[in-house]
A protein has these predicted regions:
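Metal-dependent de-N-acetylase/amidase catalytic core
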Residues: 7, 11-14, 18-166
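Generic hydrophobic, amphipathic alpha-helix propensity
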Residues: 1-2
Length: 166
């Protein structure tokens, strides 16, 4: 299903052949994910948001985040949300992408996930896309949280965190 969805989107799917459930966050799996990411030399990595009701989402987020921390190369790292309020919790975006022109393509790709009722997933995502679009001034948008290695103060932090003269 995932590879069929990738075909619809015109992207190359890369799977690590993990079981559907019960993957541990351990040194072996972190090394495997880190090696795979390093081998691809990506510009960005997009991973699940770790505060999620679904255990597989939390696991994949933890593995990707550990790989990001362990990486010897630098790449952009973003978290995405999955059905905010139902699965992803406490998600406060730092970045948005207007998906208005590709929403139909995303819908088609979700329909490939027959075992997960892709149409029902689409209906939940469509509400989320419209809400996120409203937040950023687009008809539909996806939201992301960007992690930054540069140790800079991010917009929105309280003023007390900016001052170093305490």
């Amino acid at each position: 299903e995932a590879l069929a969805a990738c075909d619809v989107l015109g992207v190359r799917g890369i799977l690590l052949d993990y079981p559907h459930e019960g993957v541990d966050v351990n040194r072996e799996n972190i090394a495997r994910v880190t090696e795979k990411i390093a081998g691809e030399n990506p510009d960005i990595v997009v991973a699940h948001w770790p505060v999620d009701t679904h255990p597989d989402h939390r696991t994949s987020a933890a593995l990707a985040l550990a790989a990001y921390i362990d990486a010897e190369t630098t790449f952009g790292f973003y978290h995405f949300e999955v059905m905010t309020g139902q699965q992803s919790m406490h998600f406060h975006p730092t970045h948005y992408v207007d998906i208005s022109e590709v929403a139909k393509l995303k819908h088609e790709s979700l329909l490939c996930h027959k075992s997960q009722d892709g149409e029902a997933v689409w209906q939940s995502h469509e509400l989320m896309h419209r809400f996120r679009g409203h937040e950023c001034g687009a008809p539909r948008a996806e939201a992301y949280i960007r992690l930054d290695r540069r140790h800079t103060v991010q917009p929105g932090l309280p003023d007390l965190l900016v001052s170093s003269s305490v």
